[in-house]
Regions:
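DNA-contacting surface of Y-family translesion DNA polymerases
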Residues: 1-129, 145
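Acidic, metal-coordinating catalytic segment for phosphate/diphosphate chemistry
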Residues: 94, 101-189
Length: 189
């Protein structure tokens, strides 16, 4: 070992050590936080109503927010997208998306849901049969790095964060993972 160290450069030394069974490069993958979280689905039956799409978007937002909190992160924006069945040329084709920037980066399901519903309402068109929809959370940062808003009190922020933790704990212990959900929607299975 000392001869190799004296005679060759560090790359050659590491190669020699690796060939002799001594790992020199850490091969364990680092767990990186996601830069975006997407939750979407194609529907078995097409959805024609705003109410039907609202329930689907609410479910997707709830799932995405749960993933966000699981990695101790917050999102500064939420995008909603909807599209008709592109394989059905006999039907009117439509796809659109909208993004809402949050007042403050958050992982609060109700705040994200309010923004998602507003985005959905801005792009929904009556008379279209929708086949696919989804949400994308972006602008993701670690929850310790969130720039607080001047318009949201620290006390309110802490209460909301504690509420989300309690809801996640209860839901994690249930078989369906949606024992407790936002009252304005029913989870879509």
């Amino acid at each position: 070992y000392s001869t190799i160290h004296k005679e060759f450069n560090i790359t050659t030394e590491r190669t020699w050590r690796e060939l002799n069974g001594e790992p020199c490069v850490d091969m364990t993958p680092e767990e990186t936080e996601k830069k975006q979280i997407c939750c979407s689905r194609s529907f078995g039956e097409m959805i024609k109503t705003l109410d039907g799409l609202t329930k689907a978007i609410a479910t997707f937002t709830t799932i995405a927010a749960r993933k966000l909190r699981k990695q101790n992160s917050c999102a500064s924006a939420i995008s909603v997208f909807i599209q008709s069945n592109r394989f059905r040329n006999d039907m009117e084709q439509y796809s659109n998306s909208a993004i809402r920037i949050m007042e403050e980066s958050t992982a609060d399901t109700s705040m994200l849901l309010n923004a998602a519903i507003k985005a959905l309402e801005s792009i929904f068109r009556h008379g279209i049969s929708y086949k696919r929809a989804g949400v994308i959370l972006s602008g993701i940062v670690n929850d310790t790095l969130v720039q607080p808003s001047l318009f949201i009190s620290q006390d309110k922020r802490e209460r909301r964060n504690n509420l989300m933790k309690i809801i996640d704990t209860i839901n994690a212990s249930s078989a369906t993972h949606d024992t407790i959900h936002i009252a304005s929607y029913e989870p879509v299975s």
